[in-house]
Curated annotation (Swiss-Prot):
Pfam families linked to this entry: RuBisCO_small
Matches recorded under SMART domains: RuBisCO_small
Keywords, ordered alphabetically: Calvin cycle, Carbon dioxide fixation
Classification via HAMAP family: RuBisCO_S_bact (MF_00859)
Purpose: RuBisCO catalyzes two reactions: the carboxylation of D-ribulose 1,5-bisphosphate, the primary event in carbon dioxide fixation, as well as the oxidative fragmentation of the pentose substrate. Both reactions occur simultaneously and in competition at the same active site. Although the small subunit is not catalytic it is essential for maximal activity.
Protein name: Ribulose bisphosphate carboxylase small subunit 1
Length: 110
């Protein structure tokens, strides 16, 4: 039991938080996967200090039926430009199961 300790680390907000940061190409592939599953992309943002205790703000409306990875990336970047200090995440809404199929932070706030 002497080996067990509490590790101080950055907060984890979603699946990929435990992996090294994704580069642009890996991000594109994740967005393409989300779209290929038939999930509707949606963008959310929040102040870093409120990320784990409050709902995240919706950026515009979910992009129902969007098939273009580039369009999703442009909206992610637009949200980040409008709210540079916020965390920005992409959510894939699954119509069939009426739940989130995927969610990951794209930009981390300061």
């Amino acid at each position: 039991m002497a080996d067990i300790q509490d590790y101080n680390s950055t907060p984890k907000y979603e699946t990929f938080s435990y992996l090294p940061a994704m580069g642009p190409e890996k991000m594109r592939r994740q967005i393409a996967y989300l779209i290929n599953q038939g999930w509707n992309p949606g963008i959310e943002h929040v102040e870093p200090e409120r990320a784990s205790t409050y709902y995240w703000y919706m950026w515009k409306l979910p992009m129902f039926g969007e098939q273009s990875v580039d369009t999703v990336i442009m909206e992610l970047e637009a949200c980040h430009r409008a709210h540079p200090g916020h965390h920005v995440r992409l959510v894939g809404y699954d119509n069939y199961s009426q739940s989130q199929g995927s969610a990951f932070v794209v930009f981390r706030g300061r």
